[in-house]
Amino acid sequence: MWNRLAALPPYFGGKRKLLRQIFKHLPPPVEAPVFVDAFLGGGSVSLFAKARGYRVLCNDVALRSFVVGKALIENDHVTLGQGDVTRLFQENGNRSDFIERHYSPDVVTTRHARFLDTAFANARAAVGTKKWLLLLLLVKFILRMRPMGNFGAKTIIHQVEAGEWEAMNPHYVRDMLTRNVCGHPKRVAEVLREQINAGVFSNGQENRAYQQDVFEFLRGVEGDILYLDPPYAGTSAYETSLKALDSILEGLRVEPKPSVFSRGKATESLERLFEASQRFPVWVLSYGNREVQLETLVRLVEKFMPVVVAESYRYTHLTGLSSAEHRERNRELLIVAKGKKR
């Protein structure tokens, strides 16, 4: 796997394994220079598009994704030094105990919560691109502390807090040792710093990250290729499963606002999205097959675009978080559609 992808946070809906399939039907940057990513998510598609030389305009309503866009897509030269990591541990008069009060020991251990309360105060005080890089490091740190990135697993964190090693799942104990979960936070932060720095590069383009509602974003940008990866109907909504992470990142308890794509009829929200996308001459759409089958999706896209290529791939996002039955029937639907620029 391309080593720059390690800079990104692990994301349940990530497209790292599908990058070659997504890009194989697309015109090169010399023919279609501007790549628009309307649902940035974990950032793998935008980072790959940047590496290929497209000018990337990416967007996501979630702050966790916007952090990725600012730190790795928009940023083309600023990296983190060892001193930046050291400053995360310095006492800060604006430090609160928000994370320790609300998220230990259910989400992270008390020791890690105290570090994170200090680290977030220092990261938010940083200036310019360094702020986004440090916030990305802390997002990756939190996800690294979670069993397979799963925020629903409280028992294991309670066992770590109490030192009940013999009672713990041995698979997680091995994983925890591999990821140095019990080590000093600075050692983990140094590993994450190096990962993030490897993802910072220039492609000679002026790339931009936005944090907007998708329909507002689509009205305001122009481009040649539009990548659409909306939340899949019938699956766990990110805003619910990542509520704890979003709250920690915001510094306050947030209540999830369900996406229009996660509730209601899937075809209605998709049709509205496609209608708002008609100005773009090339679409790439990725979607899950939980509620919408490939044939239905093709018919819907054909209402707006004359040339449609459709493929279906067996795809598992996180093996440890899905049943054998789910892995067997799960498919990633991929559509490339072409029309005329309007």
Identify the meaning behind each predicted range:
Residues 31-87:
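Conserved S-adenosyl-L-methionine
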Residues 107-226, 233-241, 252-254:
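SAM-dependent nucleic-acid methyltransferase catalytic core
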Residues 231-268:
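Mobile active-site "lid"/loop adjacent to the S-adenosyl-L-methionine
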Residues 263-313:
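Conserved Class I SAM-dependent methyltransferase catalytic core
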